[in-house]
Regions:
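Short glycine/serine/threonine-rich phosphate/pyrophosphate-binding segments
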Residues: 49-52, 103-110, 128-132, 252
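C-terminal charged capping/lid subdomain of soluble metabolic enzymes
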Residues: 2-7, 295-376
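ATP/NTP phosphate-donor binding region
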Residues: 1-95
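A short, small-residue-rich loop immediately preceding and capping a beta-strand
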Residues: 88-111, 115-126
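Short alpha-helical scaffolding segments that buttress acidic/His motifs in well-ordered protein cores
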Residues: 177, 181-185, 229-243, 282, ...
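Active-site segments that bind and position negatively charged phosphate/pyrophosphate groups
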Residues: 195-311
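A glycine/threonine-rich phosphate-anchoring loop and its flanking beta-alpha core
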Residues: 18, 113-205
Length: 376
């Protein structure tokens, strides 16, 4: 008798979208027939404004396709998901097209996942790898992180139109750099001593990704549309997605994203982007390694990152996150969320308490020798 998948030790990898289209002015040309004849377009207001002309030219070739346009609100929250699912059912939607940044695409992917519909993603910034991944993050209506949802599949297609990305605010690319950098600093820890060939390859891909960003980010920001810019855009959307897709759960998040999740529970956190919080979280993760393990390698890595952060405008400290006004009690609340029992911070090879994390959060830009390990 054959065992069912649930009875087997099965490693699942969802490495990539079904198809990845990359180019300039391609949104109006790429076939969208996979979505069927009744399509729901979900996106942010700015993103829909930017993408709508090209999409309308695309669908003008097929007048029988009915298009329904809607914004997703502010967050990928359960209330928004329920509203959009009801709309899709009411309109007998046959496919979902997600347009925008990370939260818009996460929303579109999760609606498609729940309704078992095809999904095509169209990123309008390089702020995250959401257009690539088989994962959606769910937030409360006030923007506090609640959980992530692993999807059954990556998008059926990803349309990366560089002209759309070039129109995005430069800050979104900076945030994407911060989010993508975390792939190395987290996957190199979360992968442990894995002997799985795909995990090993994913971690090495994360190293390549990190090096590309360290070397090319400043040039990319100085010349939007140039060679370095295109490489960094591809790195933030595609290479970062490959790491998580190929490595699976072994190559996902650790302390950097746990810090992000904790910070989302603070008032005022909406002033910063996902990747900015994650970038700050990388520094906090490295500080934990310094504080709790006395790691000189972590100090060297943090020093290297701080120089890049200064060059491109990523946050070095709580002041840069517009959170310097918060007291220890409020910051400890964020640290407690980040250290909950099911938090990815516990993928670190040493125990972390909220009190230790609080020290790390308040000393991310500390320079010089690592102080002695505090009694926490």
């Amino acid at each position: 008798m054959l065992s069912t998948p649930s009875e087997l030790d099965v490693a699942v990898a969802i490495p990539a979208p079904g198809r990845v289209y990359r180019g300039h002015h391609i949104l109006e040309a790429v076939p969208l027939t996979v979505l069927g004849s009744r399509v729901l377009v979900i996106g942010g207001e700015r993103s829909l404004t930017v993408a709508e002309p090209a999409l309308k030219r695309n669908w003008a070739r097929d007048p029988h396709t009915q298009i329904h346009w809607t914004t997703y609100g502010v967050d990928c929250s359960e209330s928004e998901l329920r509203r959009l699912q009801a709309l899709a059912i009411e309109e007998a939607i046959t496919g979902i097209l997600g347009v925008g940044g990370g939260k818009a695409l996460d929303t579109a992917k999760l609606v498609a996942h729940r309704l078992r519909l095809p999904i095509v993603t169209v990123p309008t910034s390089a702020a995250t790898c959401a257009a690539w991944s088989a994962l959606s993050n769910v937030y409360s209506d006030t923007g506090a992180f609640e959980r992530d949802v692993v999807l059954d599949k990556a998008p059926d297609a990803l349309i990366l139109d560089y002209e759309l990305i070039r129109q995005a605010p430069p800050r979104t690319l900076v945030a994407g750099i911060g989010d993508a950098l975390a792939k190395w600093y987290e996957s190199s820890v979360s992968s442990g001593a894995s002997e799985d060939a795909l995990v090993i390859a994913a971690v090495q891909q994360a190293r390549v990704l990190r090096d590309l960003l360290l070397q090319g980010s400043l040039a990319a920001l100085q010349e939007p549309g140039g060679v370095a810019w295109k490489q960094v855009v591809d790195a933030c959307i595609c290479l970062a997605g490959i790491v998580g897709g190929m490595g699976g759960a072994k190559c996902r998040t650790v302390a950097a994203h746990a810090v992000h999740n904790g910070l989302t529970h603070l008032l005022g956190q909406r002033a910063t982007l996902h990747g900015e919080k994650v970038a700050f979280g990388i520094l906090a993760q490295l500080r934990l390694e310094e504080i709790l393990q006395g790691s000189q390698l972590a100090l060297a890595a943090r020093t290297q990152l701080m120089e890049l952060y200064r060059q491109v405008g990523l946050p070095l400290n709580l002041r840069d996150l517009h959170l310097a006004h918060l007291g220890s009690a409020e910051l400890l609340q964020a640290a407690q969320v980040a250290c909950q029992a099911d938090s990815d911070i516990h993928h670190l090879p040493f125990p972390v308490s909220p009190e230790a994390l609080l020290v790390a959060l308040t000393t991310t830009d500390l320079t010089g020798a690592t102080p002695a390990t505090p009694k926490l």
